[in-house]
Amino acid sequence: MEKVKQTIRAPRGTELQTKGWVQEAALRMLMNNLDPEVAEKPEELVVYGGIGRAARNWESYQAIVDSLKTLESDETLLVQSGKPVAIFKSHEDAPRVLLANSNLVPKWANWDHFRELEKKGLMMYGQMTAGSWIYIGTQGILQGTYETFGEAARQHFGGSLKGTLTLTAGLGGMGGAQPLAVTMNGGVVIAIDVDKRSIDRRIEKRYCDMYTESLEEALAVANEYKEKKEPISIGLLGNAAEILPELVKRNITPDLVTDQTSAHDPLNGYIPVGYTLEEAAKLREEDPERYVQLSKESMTKHVEAMLAMQEKGAITFDYGNNIRQVAFDEGLKNAFDFPGFVPAFIRPLFCEGKGPFRWVALSGDPEDIYKTDEVILREFADNEHLCNWIRMARQQVEFQGLPSRICWLGYGERAKFGRIINEMVANGELSAPIVIGRDHLDCGSVASPNRETEAMKDGSDSVADWPILNALINSVNGASWVSVHHGGGVGMGYSLHAGMVIVADGTEAAAKRIERVLTSDPGMGVVRHVDAGYDLAVETAKEKGVNIPMMK
């Protein structure tokens, strides 16, 4: 991949570079994904998650930009794995962009085949929100992480993480949310990363409190704050596959253990034991097969240590990076003895159509986001948990790139919020249109048996019709851009997922599209969980009037 040193930053204000606000939104969000404040390696078009890219290569990026600038409001741009391949006449209510990223026929859906295609310039890895142009930095996963640790606290520690120690690893674009999510829940956390730049970045953005290279110092500070029942987050430089076994050897057992290293990609994401970043980069280039094998061996040690901590009483869970699968394939037959975070903590939210709803101020003015915060506090005042989140986010979350906010809203709530936002744009309360989107990690848009659809009640973990149906209904209902991806979060062969974005530009046409899309999108989550036999989903569907032909 050619590295290009250029600073990309989305335009601000109300002057259009394109022929309409929906095209402008797509252009600005693509550029925002590559803002140095947002992207992990913008010079390589990498947004987050190992090699999750916004465009296939720099030539494709420029062609996408040029296409969006000339795209008419009754045309649709098609993007195939980060490359613009066609512009067709459609209609004004159709999506302006349709994206398909990293999709492979199942028999060939593995990293080896993907890398062959990538080398030939035929494919890119889109992760989830990298290739679909709706990544907003670490805040994008923060509330989900906060909810996960909050539910762990409710289930196991009386509702708070005060006086507890969480041990985790991985402080990249996704995992970087963990330190702040734990301290927001009152706990102490040691978060390990092998890359000092990742820790520095989290400290700079106030997601992590302190840095150390010493395990002894990390433990001393953690114990001091744990005894005081005060929160603190400690970024520890090191390799988790070395540090966790060392803690097991010393008989040190944290209260909570998880992991968000980029284990989904053994070649580009995980650093084997005994290698510096520079040595790892050299080996990756010279002998990728050996690198992958060493990575897998290190991951197996990592999981063995997590299992040992679980046996000693630590609440242990997989945080969706497929590390258990790698260890299992390497011969660790009890690798799945600890659960994934979705069945352990998040699925009840999915049954209610809840998920990581996000919005972005295209104006670039933080005041637009603060005004929308007030809408949440006013319109959803009876949801104290949600309002607490908004208050904490305002105080503690620093914007990356265009100002944005995330909060988990459910079926009915998303459409209500979208309507209000569109009205605020229409009457001038907000200075420019708002982009509304979500992660692909949502209630009805993913098939991922080791993550979002792990341990489904009816055994339908691997059924991949649901994300396809999600993308189809969102497209016909008028989402501004829709994406279908493969391999996000857990790597090639293990997931299919869909994303949608809709623009609130203040028009009556947008209001109708928002009503349709922000009803059908979370509605798919309710439907998917009704179909799997979840009582809470059935209750939600009946209460909200979701039309499900065979529901009992």
Curated annotation (Swiss-Prot):
E.C. numbers: 4.2.1.49
Q: Give me the Gene Ontology terms describing cellular component.
A: cytoplasm
Note the PROSITE patterns from the entry.
UROCANASE
Q: Where does it localize?
A: Cytoplasm
Q: What does the entry's cofactor note say about binding and number?
A: Binds 1 NAD(+) per subunit.
Residues the record lists as binding NAD(+): 49-50, 127, 173-175, 193, 239-240, 260-264, 270-271, 319, 489
Q: Which domain of life is it from?
A: Bacteria
| Pfam family name, one | Urocanase
Pathway it works in: Amino-acid degradation; L-histidine degradation into L-glutamate; N-formimidoyl-L-glutamate from L-histidine: step 2/3
Q: Which cofactor does it need?
A: NAD(+)
The reaction(s) this protein catalyses: 4-imidazolone-5-propanoate = trans-urocanate + H2O
- What keywords are assigned to this protein? Cytoplasm, Histidine metabolism, Lyase, NAD
Instruction: Name the InterPro entries for this protein.
Output: Urocanase (IPR055351), Urocanase-like (IPR023637), Urocanase_C (IPR035401), Urocanase_central_sf (IPR038364), Urocanase_CS (IPR023636), Urocanase_N (IPR035400), Urocanase_Rossmann-like (IPR035085), Urocanase_sf (IPR036190)
Q: Give GO terms for biological process.
A: L-histidine catabolic process to glutamate and formamide; L-histidine catabolic process to glutamate and formate
What terms describe the molecular function in GO for this protein? urocanate hydratase activity
Q: Which residues form the active site?
A: 407
This molecule's function is given as:
Catalyzes the conversion of urocanate to 4-imidazolone-5-propionate.
State the similarity comment: Belongs to the urocanase family.
Q: What is this protein called?
A: Urocanate hydratase
Which organism encodes this protein? Bacillus anthracis
Q: Which gene encodes it?
A: hutU
